[in-house]
A protein has these predicted regions:
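Noncatalytic partner-interaction/assembly domains of nucleic-acid and motor enzyme complexes
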Residues: 1-97
Length: 97
């Protein structure tokens, strides 16, 4: 649930990834799908592209990895599960342990 909350917060808040980039690595995530989503977010960030539901979806689709994470429906679930990104750093530190 924490992994989902952090990924969802990153999807909904443009400052989400910068808040956790020094805390989390791809292998901080237990779920392979979450690792792939986070890796995609990092790639977008490194290219100075926005990180949101649409850009992550398009990137995963282009790399033919969308099905590996559960498709667009799973990305939408992630973004819908988070009411706020206020505690993203705290949650990221728990995941990183």
């Amino acid at each position: 649930m924490l992994e989902e909350a952090v990924l969802g917060a990153i999807l909904m808040d443009k400052d989400g990834l910068p808040a956790v980039i020094e805390i989390l690595r791809k292998d901080s995530f237990y779920s392979p799908a979450h690792q792939l989503i986070y890796e995609t977010m990092l790639e977008l960030f490194q290219k100075s592209q926005p990180i949101d539901l649409l850009t992550v979806h398009e990137s995963l689709k282009k790399s033919q990895q969308l099905d590996e994470i559960g498709g667009i429906n799973y990305l939408m679930e992630l973004s819908n599960k988070v009411a706020s990104s206020a505690n993203i750093e705290y949650h990221a530190r728990i995941i990183a342990q």
